[in-house]
């Protein structure tokens, strides 16, 4: 750092020591070393704060990654707050050409029989072959040409038509191909395709079911266009609902009930069916213990990684240059020190200087203690230990350990209890502004995942409380991409250090200039004395 400061300060071209023969630059630099040392010290303090902030942010990112994976409702496969996530089944069907199925949370029955009488279909129309060519048109024909050929009305040099009540407008200088794209991209709910090989159009509704339709007869332009393209447009075309009988369900007259759905994929009592053909199929579900176990294990493994990371940060000691408990702590290198070292030496030094900066950090201790409590305290449904998940020693951060056999047995024997331990939800919603009484009540009524969710919210929440506060870790170190990246405690301290550094450099510059002026006066005086001495010598020697 001393040399960098010298570079900043020595921006003037100076001619020094001409009369005295002294190395004025070296003398001045030596005389301001105390001030340079002050700047170096504050720069080191600033660097330590920046490294500390980086350490905090690495933990923030780890917690956010954990939250994104297991607490995101948009990721149902790993959303551990939902009971549905814990119910997994193996599914077998006797005829996949009739129907397939998968579980969607807890199912009411494990065996089902489905008789498919009709698949859901889209509304569909096909044009006669070659009709476009017979009208002397092509897909590249201008809308004006299409209008003239098919008797369409243009207004303000635009074609307007309605399909399913949705108006579509296009300029006369556009092409038929552009019109097809405009229809497909509109909210009319239909899609048109064209085969140049067959010179044939196909129109389909985007949705299936009896409510899906293609209505072009209510608008003269639309009717004439489609008629001219070779379609039969005498009536509105409708799709079809899927029709099936499920599990022999009967009505009051003893007749099997025919159920209709507007799609071939639908969910009934936790089972999602996909119909593939007409016929009968039997579907059997069996609980997939291994899949449920793996979901829980993945969650616990990620939790343990966080516990291990934070435990390491709050317990690792700052190394000293003289070994254990001896010598000074490793500090950030000054520029002068860096210039005297190799890249490898610098890397090794900085690794040590970055170690132990969060030792005994109270904020991280708080995260750790609350996470441990959330997972280890009893819930109203029992504790994790009762299903084979126990806490290790405090020396290894009290990580959780899974007894695979015991957990799998708990899943097989009483999955509902396992789910309740993890996901039981309080009637009180999370809020950073909840009173201590409400927090205590919510904690008591919640499962371990809900409790852990509250911890994450308190520490890495990006929304503000009524007092304007975000998560505690964000207020401390900030989150990249969030307003707290620049508005947080550590960044404020870093900026204050930078301001102080600039203040010290300004004072150092002033002192250096003052010294150079004094030496310049000295050089001038010596030069005059030398000139006088020469004059006396010359005159007395005559």
State the predicted function of each range.
Residues 324-346:
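Intrinsically disordered, low-complexity segments enriched in small/polar residues
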Residues 65:
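Acidic/charged coordination and interface sites in well-structured regions
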Residues 311-314, 318, 508-541:
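Structured, hydrophobic secondary-structure cores that serve as assembly/anchoring elements
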Residues 54-62:
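Long, contiguous alpha-helical "rod/stalk" segments
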Residues 39, 50-53, 512:
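Juxtamembrane membrane-water interface segments immediately C-terminal to a transmembrane helix
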Residues 78-83, 196-197, 313-329, 538-539:
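Short, glycine/acidic-rich hinge or "gate" loops at secondary-structure transitions
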Residues 1-47, 68-199, 204-310, 339-506, ...:
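Bacterial flagellar/type III secretion structural subunits and associated motility module proteins
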């Amino acid at each position: 750092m001393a040399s960098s400061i010298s570079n900043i300060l020595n921006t003037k071209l100076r001619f020094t020591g001409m009369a005295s023969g002294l190395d004025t630059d070296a003398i001045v630099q030596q005389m301001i070393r105390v001030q340079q040392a002050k700047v170096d010290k504050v720069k080191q303090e600033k660097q330590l704060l920046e490294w500390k902030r980086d350490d905090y942010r690495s933990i923030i990112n780890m917690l956010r990654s954990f939250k994104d994976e297991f607490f995101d409702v948009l990721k149902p496969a790993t959303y551990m707050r939902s009971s549905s996530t814990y119910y997994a089944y193996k599914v077998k069907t006797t005829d996949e050409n009739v129907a397939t199925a998968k579980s969607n949370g807890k199912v009411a029955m494990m065996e089902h029989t489905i008789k498919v009488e009709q698949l859901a279909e889209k509304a569909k129309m096909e044009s006669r072959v070659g009709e476009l060519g017979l009208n002397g048109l092509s897909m590249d024909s201008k809308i004006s040409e299409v209008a003239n050929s098919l008797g369409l009305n243009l207004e303000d040099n635009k074609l307007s038509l309605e399909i399913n009540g949705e108006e579509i407008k296009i300029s006369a200088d556009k092409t038929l191909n552009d019109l097809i794209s405009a229809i497909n991209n509109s909210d009319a709910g239909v899609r048109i395709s064209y085969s140049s090989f067959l010179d044939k159009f196909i129109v389909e509704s985007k949705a299936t079911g009896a409510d899906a339709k293609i209505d072009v007869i209510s608008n003269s332009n639309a009717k004439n266009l489609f008629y001219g393209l070779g379609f039969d447009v005498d009536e509105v075309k409708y799709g079809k609902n899927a029709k099936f009988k499920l599990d022999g369900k009967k009505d009051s007259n003893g007749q099997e009930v025919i159920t209709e759905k507007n799609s071939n994929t639908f969910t009934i009592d936790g089972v999602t069916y996909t119909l593939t053909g007409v016929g009968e199929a039997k579907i059997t579900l069996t609980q997939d213990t291994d899949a449920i176990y793996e979901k829980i294990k993945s969650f616990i493994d990620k939790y343990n990684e966080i516990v291990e990371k934070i435990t390491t940060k709050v317990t690792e000691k700052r190394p000293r240059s003289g070994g254990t408990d001896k010598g000074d702590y490793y500090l950030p290198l000054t520029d002068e020190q860096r210039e005297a070292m190799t890249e490898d030496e610098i890397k090794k030094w900085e690794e040590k200087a970055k170690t132990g900066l969060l030792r005994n950090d109270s904020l991280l201790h708080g995260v750790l203690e609350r996470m441990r409590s959330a997972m280890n305290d009893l819930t109203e449904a029992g504790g994790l230990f009762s299903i084979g998940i126990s806490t290790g020693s405090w020396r290894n951060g009290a990580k959780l350990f899974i007894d695979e056999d015991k957990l799998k047995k708990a899943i097989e024997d009483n999955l509902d209890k396992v789910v309740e331990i993890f996901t039981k939800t309080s009637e009180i919603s999370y809020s950073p502004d909840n009173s201590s009484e409400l927090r205590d009540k919510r904690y008591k009524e919640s499962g371990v995942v809900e409790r852990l969710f509250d911890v994450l919210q308190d520490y890495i929440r990006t929304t503000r409380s009524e007092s304007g506060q975000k998560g505690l870790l964000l207020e401390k170190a900030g989150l990249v991409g969030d307003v707290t990246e620049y508005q947080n405690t550590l960044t404020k301290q870093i900026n204050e250090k930078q301001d102080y550094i600039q203040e010290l450099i300004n004072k150092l510059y002033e002192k250096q200039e003052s010294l150079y002026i004094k030496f310049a006066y000295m050089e001038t005086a010596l030069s005059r004395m030398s000139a006088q001495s020469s004059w006396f010598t010359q005159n007395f020697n005559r």
